[in-house]
Amino acid sequence: MKVYRTAAITAVWRSMSNLDEYSVKHVNLPSRFLAYILGILDPNSVATISERTRIIDSAIKKINPKCIVEIGAGFSSRQEKFENIKFYELDLPYFQKFKKNVISFEIGKDKLKLKTKDALFIVEGVTMYLQKEQVLSLLKQIRKYNGHILIDFFSKEQSTKKKSMREKLFKILFKLIIKRNYLFDYRIDSIQDGINLFKKSGYKNIKYLEYKIPKTLDVLFYAQL
């Protein structure tokens, strides 16, 4: 299943970065092997996952929220790392096979109905698999609550047309693993486009959180609800 494979890849890459030894326990051996090969072919993607994880975990410590809502949680083990914070882990029903506390939630179909007034919403590694309408709807729903949001997008501005042979091989293998003829759906045009998206959705105190790596499509934002 596609959602399992993408979540498995993220879990393995976090493990390769020595950031998360817990979530990989849900990944079967064939998926671990394939994700590891992908990581070798494209170490910059592993570095992106590593940097994003570090920044988000650091932000959690700084904000110190009473509640965290992870949308598209996958195999994330943050609930185990931050034991004193109440977590709502939202994802497709498929993940309830692995994590009993996962709340069934399908973006574009389900509505957010959480009994929390103030929370940190984390939407990590999700938007690139959505349509624009789904992204806008999700931002609108989250905006109804109080608190903060950390969310990443892929940016067309960061894309490079010239690909190395390793990157081309990675792209072919990734498509085969997730069983799609194309890699991603929604992308913002630029960092400024992302900032404008938040402003139009009613968010404030918007910040672009820059990664300390030379080459990545991924851009991470913080904003207040």
Task: Walk through the language-model features, giving the residues of each.
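Conserved Class I S-adenosyl-L-methionine
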Residues: 163-188
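Short amphipathic alpha-helix with an adjacent loop that forms part of the alpha/beta core around
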Residues: 109-117
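A short, conserved alpha-helix within the catalytic core of class I
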Residues: 111, 129-145
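Core SAM-dependent methyltransferase catalytic element
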Residues: 210-225
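Short alpha-helix
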Residues: 182-208
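A conserved beta-strand element that flanks and buttresses the S-adenosyl-L-methionine
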Residues: 121-122
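Conserved beta-strand signature within the Rossmann-like core of class I S-adenosyl-L-methionine
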Residues: 143-158
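Rossmann-like AdoMet
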Residues: 1-69, 75-105
